Design a protein with these regions (language model features):
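A non-catalytic alpha/beta surface segment that caps or lines the substrate-entry region
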Residues: 2-52
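Glycine/charged-rich beta-loop-alpha catalytic/anionic-binding loops adjacent to active sites
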Residues: 55, 59-69
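Active-site-proximal beta-strand/loop segments in catalytic clefts of secreted hydrolases
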Residues: 48-49, 60-63, 103-107, 150-153, ...
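His/Asp/Glu-rich mid-to-C-terminal helical/loop segments that flank catalytic regions of hydrolases
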Residues: 221-266
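Acidic/histidine-rich catalytic neighborhood of metal-dependent amide-processing enzymes
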Residues: 67-181, 189-194, 198-201
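N-terminal capping segment at the start of a domain
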Residues: 1-16, 22, 64, 228-245
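Extracytoplasmic/secreted proteins, especially bacterial periplasmic and envelope-associated proteins
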Residues: 2, 16, 20, 24-32, ...
């Protein structure tokens, strides 16, 4: 099954994609953990364990979508589809680390925040956010080597690695490793600042992390050089323009291939 076909099936589920994610993973014979932290809100996790591994690499993708869109194809159904395809590719394989693929809920609450959001307001919001609740219950956070958040994986011919997400700085050392992996394996890549606050949960728990995704290379280059003009592909998120029509199979496959290289080389 092509990754875009997985994405189509996810979109057909409407706003609740949890059942599809569960059924897809269990159909592969994979053991899945479900964390229901509030009524109707679920994180879903698949772990490829290594008995000798002492550290964890975690991939976060949020499966909820903005209320302003019916499909949320790029933000963030594309990343969900890529991670499901990755799960199929790595089942039965052993890696130097425990690899945790985590599909989180209610992250769009953070996407709606403004820079002026008060600390008090954040304290009220965070217990509703899937990544925060997942990390709050993680048994031994010092064993987390890295967290890689995936956002906007469905459009573009290059990989972006975020130097900053909203007001949160990402891990400089991790970013360099990822950019080096991209260069060694002939992926076009660019480092840039993201306006969204996808790293907030990671920051709260003081864990190494960053954000990656796909982006048209020349749009990214113009954004990096000019600093103010958002890439056109970002202007369509949280709107009805964020739909299946714009999604590119090549971008989805590129992201999955990059993730496989990360698992082998990080």
């Amino acid at each position: 099954m092509k990754i875009k076909e997985i994405l189509c099936e996810l979109i057909a589920c409407g706003r609740n994609r949890t059942q599809y994610i569960l059924e897809y993973l269990t159909s592969l014979g994979l053991a899945v953990d479900v964390q229901e932290y509030l009524p109707g809100h679920k994180n879903i996790e698949f772990v490829t364990s290594n008995d000798k591994a002492k550290q964890d690499i975690i991939f976060f993708v949020h499966h909820d979508i903005s209320l302003k869109t019916r499909e949320g194809a790029n933000d963030n159904t594309s990343s969900v589809a890529v991670l499901l395809a990755l799960a199929k590719s790595i089942r039965g394989k052993a890696f130097p680390y425990n690899i945790r693929l985590v599909f989180t809920d209610n992250e769009e609450l953070l996407g709606a925040l403004s820079p002026s959001t008060t600390a008090e307001k954040l304290q009220q919001i965070m217990p509703h956010v899937g990544s925060f609740m997942y990390l709050s219950k993680f048994p031994d956070k010092k064993n987390i080597r890295h967290i890689i958040v995936m956002e906007l994986s469905g459009i573009g011919d290059s990989i972006y690695v975020a130097s900053q997400s909203g007001n949160v700085m990402t891990d400089v050392s991790l970013n360099k490793k990822l950019l080096d992996i991209a260069e060694r394996n002939n992926f076009q890549s660019v480092q840039l600042k993201l306006p969204s606050t996808d790293m907030l949960s990671v920051k709260v728990f003081r864990v190494s992390g960053t954000v990656i995704g796909a982006i048209p290379y020349y749009q990214a280059q113009n954004y990096v050089m000019q600093g103010k003009m958002f890439p056109a592909v970002w202007q369509n998120i949280h709107s009805e323009k964020d739909n299946l029509f714009a999604i590119q199979e090549k971008a989805l496959e590129m992201m999955k291939d990059f993730l496989l290289h990360i698992l082998e080389e990080l």
